[in-house]
Amino acid sequence: MKPLSPLQQKLSKRTQALLNHPQGMGNYFTFKTAIDILGLDWADVAPGGVYAVTGKGYFDMGYMANHIGPSQAAVEALCQASADEDLVKVYPPDCMPELKALVAEHKFGRKLGKDFEVLGVEGAQGGIGYTYMTFLDPGDEVIVTDPGYFHFVPAAELCGAKVVPIELNAGNGFRLKPAEVRAAITPKTKMIVVCDPINPFGTVQTKDELLEIARLARDAGIIIFNNITHNTHQTDAKAVQIPMASLHSAEHDMSHVMSVSGVSKGYGMPALRVGFMAGHPELVRGAFLAKMELTKIHINYPGQHATLAAMKDEPYLERSTEIIRRNFAHLKETVAMNPGVSIPVEPSFGFCTVIDVAGTGVTAQEVTVGLLKHKIAAIPGDGLGDVKCADYLRLNYSSPDLACFETFRKALPLAIKEAQEGRYLDAVDAFFAKADTARGNGIRAQLAKRKRGVAAQ
């Protein structure tokens, strides 16, 4: 671990822990790392300082933006609200009453009432932060999946909590199994993170699994954080995704569930930063107070009006779902064409999936560099957890342009071949040497074996 500089020593202990965290921004490998390795011009690949690859000829299958974009109805509502001086000159509420009621039923499957409330926040990401801040104390334990969304682990640790991972694999169907959750619970467990659909696999929990996990948590006095932000698009036409809030009844009390969603994934509007937390008013009140004292930022009025229009636009949802199903079918065919590459589990909802490149004999990080060389941006697994961190690639298959998937079909075998030749070994190793995380050093050990093999050829 790198020693702290005198200035870094002034940071809080919580923040210092992120500097060398394997899931801290800049410490895990992404297509952005590949830009520098390849000596590309950032202005050509990601012009304007944007967070995604938008350069001409490039296709972004990395970060989870919905590349289909917003519905026309949402754009029109956004423009109208932005031009309304009466809206722009006043502070907005956290969430307009009409939107709050629609979100409660449309996203969480429950009506507003004395036992259920919705709070507007700055994107689903804001919901993650406020949920952790509201409920976690130093020493608490949080059950998460491995792999899982980048920020579930470091954000919890920033609050002083200890993360208890449950490995997702073929044995549990890449889902949380109640028996494994039960085994992970200790007297210190404060929260269980139920990301459903699960990022990065797109798998969904069954109703029975959700009810049993809810019962386990309820009996032990544990909060459930149910993140459902990927539940808008049904990749598998037969799949069913159930928001935990919708299971509330006299028999199955869900008052201990805090739910979070947003519009970035389902409605293609990440720039607007619109998200929602929902749960029992006594819990939501705590989140509201934390939010007010920390940021006091409510969702902007134009964004709220755009969201209201987007959620009412059912034809948009149908069209975008057709695109996503088409894209995954194409992606699946491509994977089948490449020996040593597999899809561990097919996604049910959302537009992210994982491919496993372990059978090719190279690391996902090397393949990431090769893919970008051939115009495809991707994310390898070391930012998602320890499990198969050098084998997994997470891919976004939401692009409306079929050329994206045709380009990927050409790029994947080329990227693998270049990686097998050892072209990117030293550069990937140098990245992890500089990051100096425990996970990265484990990947370096794999790379060292690869170097010996390449040298012997």
Region locations from a protein language model:
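N-terminal small-domain helix-loop-helix segment of the aminotransferase-like
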Residues: L18-G123, Y130, A310-M311, A419, ...
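Short, conserved charged micro-motifs
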Residues: G361-V367, A403-T407
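Helix C-cap/helix->beta junction micro-motif
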Residues: C159, D219-A220, H374
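Active-site PLP attachment segment
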Residues: H248-G286, D391
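Conserved core of the PLP fold type I
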Residues: A83-L216, N231-H233, K238-E251, M258, ...
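Structural signature of PLP-dependent enzymes
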Residues: F288-E293, A310-K332, T360-G361
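Conserved glycine-rich beta-strand-loop-beta hairpin in the small C-terminal domain of fold type I
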Residues: Q304, L308, I323-K332, I343-V357
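PLP-dependent enzyme catalytic core of the Aspartate aminotransferase-like
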Residues: K373-A377, G385-Q457
